[in-house]
């Protein structure tokens, strides 16, 4: 599980020795900018080897990332689902807009919090038969790995309600760089994978159980 590279593509080199079947990227691959500034990181991630599924973050610009990521071989999950053998993935990128005037922004992935629950519930029904159900988001749920430096919780209430009601097995997220770690909402494991720009990531192993190993400088 990776997140928050913010175009620092050299950090990807630290991960090249890992033996992984899949890369799940939880948003903010880029740091705003343009297609030209974003292109190196996108293609470097696509060249890592394993398949990559990715949700957009709030600094991944919607006016160019869908086409760029497709060209780089990245599979974007944003309001959509994917079945891979007996593992089901659903994804929702971006973040809730605290100011409603941001909704509909031409370059940013903002949404209203009340949209989160029904959208994810619909996607979750599409993977209902999967042995393991995994959610990828950029923003954490309210009250789980979402605490800012000032102590304020900055997660999504709608996402938390979805996790409480639907109880997927695992949620991977990023966004709040200072809130790396793991917690539980019911039986759902919530993992903020950390800021890859600082060399941080999470190694997930899925078998009969799910194991999570935090890797990088703060492990």
Task: Give the residues covered by each predicted segment.
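Conserved catalytic scaffold of divalent metal-dependent phosphoesterases
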Residues: 7, 60-61, 66-154, 158
